[in-house]
Amino acid sequence: MLKLIIPSIMLIPMTFLINKKSLLWTATTFFSFLIAALSTLTLNMDVAEHNSTNPLLSIDQFSCPLIMLSCWLLPLTIMGSQAHMKTEPITRQKTMISLLILLQVLLCITFGASNLLMFYIAFETTLIPTLLIITRWGNQKERLTAGLYFLFYTLSASLPLLLALIMIQTHLNSLSIYIIPLSNLTLLLNTPWSETLWWIACFLAFLIKMPLYIFHLWLPKAHVEAPIAGSMILAAILLKLGGYGMIRMSSLFIPLTKDLAVPFMIIAMWGMIVTSSICLRQTDLKSMIAYSSVSHMGLVVAGIFTMTPWAWSGALAMMIAHGLVSSGLLCLANITYERTHTRSIFMNRGLKTLFPLMSFWWLMMTFANMALPPFPNFMAEILIITSLFNWSNWTILLLGLSMTLTALFSLNMLIMTQHEHPNKHAPVNPSTTREHLLMLMHMAPIILLIANPSAIMI
């Protein structure tokens, strides 16, 4: 862990010591790629299930793939932000890159924390750089409203979680995620309603972060108003903090979760259908991708609450695969927006004739979003759907309708943007090597996961 955290921290002063604009982006991208490559070598969990570097930090089969994803996304966000930031003064460019690096450090600490209080502190601290990125570098004035939604939705559930953790510390004198399961937490409470309140306090912060349908209103606003780097990190990593926290907490509340999670599972599956239907009516590309994320994360919520090994493996695989695919789709939407200056699907028709090479990446990312075989999304959905069907036969109706709607809006997005008659645009610049490399770096891990899916299996 420290092999990743310390070099990442040292990237921040290095960023401020570089004075040339051309060297700034090249150097930070190169060194962040080195850290990402280092993560694939150091975070090898084939030998042991648990590897602790100190009492506060450790990695296991849940945290290892998510830390690797966090490290991999940093150079991609830096590459994706170059065109957006080139007109800014060099001081603001350095500030933006430093915030992205700080966010990676906080995410690595969050996923690697073995103490729940340290996990909570890092989990909440990720809010600060994300909020700064959205409110400072967003395009429209609505970014301030989006920042407020993001802030208050996240903070509203933070205090109950902190109180629940303090209560655990008071009774057990420990917040280690490896010691708490050895004791029965349910014996600490005397009444059923207090057990219910305690369980909700522990899970509400993560359900909002996922976000569960009914708590999702902050996500489309934040996605649409954030710059490309903010959108990529939000979709690829920050939503996964909720899933990771739910997996950690579920292992601590096994008897309670099986009894209390049923309403949230039903809401999650119903939310998949509703958000997929909303995607069919969306005209904004980024908003469509945001609602698509709510739909996919609803499947993860339902899978985690079944409390089966298959579902947890599928949830982890879905979080990794969705992180890469949604980030890739947002990059494609941003590449189009930088040339046509609109996110409307109706204004961005017939892009295949304008950017013939980019249409290949649109095709691949759309198929992955639809969870077609052999993409890892397909494997993840099969594992989760099998577990949910084993939990209740009636879930096949909700899940079948949701999968159909997902395929419909994904194909609608692909056909409308690529195969319709093109609108009359002002002359646009062709796609660049940097943009194709950016998409290749999204696609490469997906191809590797197709070849070796056991890398993200529990």
Swiss-Prot record:
GO molecular function: NADH dehydrogenase (ubiquinone) activity; ubiquinone binding
Subcellular localization, as worded in the UniProt entry: Mitochondrion membrane
Enzyme class: translocase
GO biological process: ATP synthesis coupled electron transport; electron transport coupled proton transport
The reaction(s) this protein catalyses: a ubiquinone + NADH + 5 H(+)(in) = a ubiquinol + NAD(+) + 4 H(+)(out)
Keyword annotations of the record: Electron transport, Membrane, Mitochondrion, NAD, Respiratory chain, Translocase, Transmembrane, Transmembrane helix, Transport, Ubiquinone
Main location per the UniProt record: mitochondrion
Enzyme Commission designation: 7.1.1.2
InterPro entries, A to Z: NADH4_N, NADH_Q_OxRdtase_chainM/4, NADH_UbQ_OxRdtase, ND/Mrp_TM
GO annotations of cellular component type: mitochondrial membrane
Topological category with respect to the lipid bilayer: Multi-pass membrane protein
Segments crossing the lipid bilayer: 23-43, 59-79, 99-119, 148-168, 174-194, 197-217, 227-247, 260-280, 289-311, 315-337, 355-375, 396-416, 438-458
Function comment: Core subunit of the mitochondrial membrane respiratory chain NADH dehydrogenase (Complex I) that is believed to belong to the minimal assembly required for catalysis. Complex I functions in the transfer of electrons from NADH to the respiratory chain. The immediate electron acceptor for the enzyme is believed to be ubiquinone.
The family this protein is said to belong to: Belongs to the complex I subunit 4 family.
Name of the protein described by the UniProt record: NADH-ubiquinone oxidoreductase chain 4
Organism (species): Petromyzon marinus (Sea lamprey)
Higher taxonomy: Eukaryota, Metazoa, Chordata, Craniata, Vertebrata
